[in-house]
């Protein structure tokens, strides 16, 4: 890769996983999920990896609450899970609310998680508040993905992978 007049060499930081998804940088570590490998990984800048097995959950989107706990979108069970550093427990069961498996997720500075369903049409985005209140905040989406909250915290932006916008 060349940027300007400098030549850069890209070097892999980590490998050995199946389908990396939902990368987040938190407390000096890169966190990411491996949906097909059913785990969440961390890796530091030296390439040292650790693994949190999540058999039966197919984790996708990740996000951190202000207290440092990790939220995990469980693709197949359609649950949002919370990892506090020791245990993994369900925070919200969205199976009766979302039309398809869960996908991307982003968490704002107030600890509210915005989770997309991977429906090719009729998808929704659900907000899970810290008190576990669940609210559908957007609907009729074509595979919502790639969510980000603007730095001022006022706008949630989302790509529609199938809708191509």
Mark where each language-model region is.
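Sequence-structural signature of mature extracellular/luminal beta-sheet repeat domains
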Residues: 1-165
